[in-house]
A protein has these predicted regions:
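Short acidic-capped amphipathic helix/loop micro-motif used as an active-site/signal-coupling element
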Residues: 44-64, 85-88, 99-105, 119-130, ...
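Specific register positions within alpha-helical solenoid repeats of the TPR/Sel1-like families, i.e.
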Residues: 55-59, 106, 110, 152, ...
């Protein structure tokens, strides 16, 4: 009390336990006295060992305590953790203490979305572990998994990401550790699907189902359902995707500790609902898709990666697809803000790409193209991934509208080639439709016939995938062409046959556009 009264110690009384913190000047004075007494090394070691024990206790409590309560207790220790790790890996420190502390502190970094800090600390710890050192095998497994997760969300599906998850899985199998086998399989699935290797990702998903079959946690068995559902969506099987994703959404058991967020760096329920929102829009339920994406944001707020995923993969694109540009602007701003605050460059790059699409829809083509290039530059090696393809189509449309038709066709051809090579078939209908629209911009003989062929291919793809929204887009483009060619009866019959299958979403941009064309044809 006297030290507090003299302003040498600060008291923190914002919780059930009063905590005391030395002011910087007092801390510097104490360190000087310790050094002078010759006790600094011994005290610093005890300090590091104490916080190693603190975080090992925190690691065991993570899966049993409510997340907010756990974070309130241990989140305030982040500076002590950093200081202890700095000593442990210093020339006068003890790397073995540092390795143990780093492995135990992973839940704190993950839950606090300090992924870049996690990556650098984990890489430092791994550098001190000898290859094949059996005494540290379990800690190395945890560190490899943490490295894979932090790399995935900060740099994307780079080779180092896959290598980290592969090593973690190998160690987990050697230790017969089913928990880390599941985590590593999730990481490898995320790596392969992001990199466009769908068949490999499906094999990983099936393997995860096998491992999870004997687990006591029912949520573990839903991980494979989620994996398969997401794969089905991107491959173009929307009915199949919906079945798997709805099972996850319906059967998921919420727990206060929400340990799955740390285990898989995503809220499983929120992740399934984000993809389900996309499926609903594709199937012709834009209002349901919008409501699903909106409600998902609240569920995902507990974790920055989950929130960025919900925004980038569902809320932003669905707002753009439905033509709600005010909502799109809000979601894009939220995505850019959160990804910047938590140093998540991949999600920030996606935010720039969505911002570009928003500018393009508003007619600001120069800004849109500039933002698109900036987003592509920031994506770096992640441009090889499946999520890059729709952004290429945005660029192709903008280039065409800006009069750079040849460049636009080159961009859409690249998108179609990537789509075919990676089996990202969900967007093939829209790519073919855009190619047809770009062909019509050319003043060359035979372009109308070529465009019509592309529109009909787009219709076929959409119908095979039960993607009613893309079917409407293709039907609208083809009906407009038929109308321009003096074939209003054909145009009316085609467009009515698609438009009248919708039961909602009549105020969205595509349906308003289709209705306006139908009215003009009558």
């Amino acid at each position: 009390a006297n030290l507090v009264a003299k302003s040498l110690v600060a008291a923190e009384v914002d919780g059930p336990v009063t905590r005391y913190r030395l002011l910087d000047t007092a801390r510097a004075y104490a360190l000087e006295k310790l050094a002078g007494s010759g006790e600094l090394e011994a005290v610093t070691r005890r300090y590091a060992e104490y916080y190693r024990d603190v975080f090992e206790r925190a690691e065991t409590e993570w899966e049993t305590r409510p997340a907010t309560e756990w974070l309130a207790d241990y989140g305030r220790q982040i500076d002590n953790l950093r200081a202890a790790l700095d000593w442990a890996f210093s020339p006068d420190g003890d790397a073995s203490v540092g390795v143990a502390m780093t492995a135990a502190a992973v839940p704190l970094w993950m839950h606090s979305s300090l992924l870049d800090e996690c990556r650098t600390r984990v890489e430092r710890a791994l550098a001190t572990i000898k290859v094949g050192e059996t005494a540290n095998a379990r800690r190395e497994m945890k560190l490899r998994a943490a490295l894979g997760a932090s790399l995935l969300y900060t740099r994307g599906a780079v080779p180092e990401t896959g290598a980290a998850w592969t090593k973690a899985l190998k160690i987990a199998e050697s230790l017969d550790d089913a928990e880390y086998q599941l985590r590593s399989l999730w990481g490898l699935w995320s790596f392969h699907i992001t990199d466009g290797h769908y068949r490999v990702a499906l094999a990983v998903a099936q393997r995860s189902c096998t491992v999870a079959a004997n687990r006591s946690d029912p949520n573990d068995r839903l991980i494979g359902e989620h994996m398969v559902g997401v794969l089905r969506h991107y491959q173009g099987d929307q009915p199949g995707a919906r079945r798997h994703l709805e099972r996850v959404f319906t059967n998921y058991a919420t727990a206060d500790h929400r340990s799955h967020i740390m285990r898989f760096q995503i809220d499983l329920r929120a992740g399934a609902r984000a993809t389900l929102a996309r499926v609903l829009w594709l199937q012709g339920f834009p209002d349901q898709a919008t409501r699903t994406a909106e409600s998902n944001i609240e569920d995902a707020r507990a974790n920055a990666s989950s929130l960025c995923s919900a925004l980038a993969l569902a809320a932003c694109p669905i707002a753009l697809w439905t033509g709600d540009l005010t909502a799109a602007e809000s979601y894009v701003g939220m995505l850019l803000n959160r990804s910047t605050r938590h140093a998540l460059p991949i999600w920030h790059a996606f935010g720039l790409c969505h911002q570009a699409a928003l500018a393009i829809k508003r007619g600001d083509l120069n800004t849109g193209l500039w933002l698109q290039h900036a987003g592509f530059d920031d994506l770096g090696e992640a441009k090889t991934g499946f999520r890059f393809i729709p952004y290429l189509s945005d660029m192709a449309e903008a280039l065409g509208r800006a009069g750079q038709i040849a460049d636009g066709i080159a961009a859409i051809d690249e998108a179609i080639e990537r789509c075919e090579r990676t089996e990202v078939h969900w967007v093939m209908s829209e790519l073919l439709r855009i190619k047809g629209e770009l062909l019509l911009l050319q003043a060359a003989p035979g372009v109308a016939a070529a465009a019509e062929d592309h529109f009909r291919q787009a219709l076929d793809w959409a119908r095979r995938q039960s993607a009613l929204s893309f079917e409407l887009c293709a039907a609208t483009s083809l009906a407009q062409l038929q109308s321009d060619q003096g074939r209003p009866a054909d145009a009316m019959a085609l467009l009515q046959s698609v438009y009248h299958r919708f039961t909602e979403g009549f105020e969205t941009a595509d349906l308003r556009g289709a209705k306006a064309l139908l009215d003009a044809l009558q």
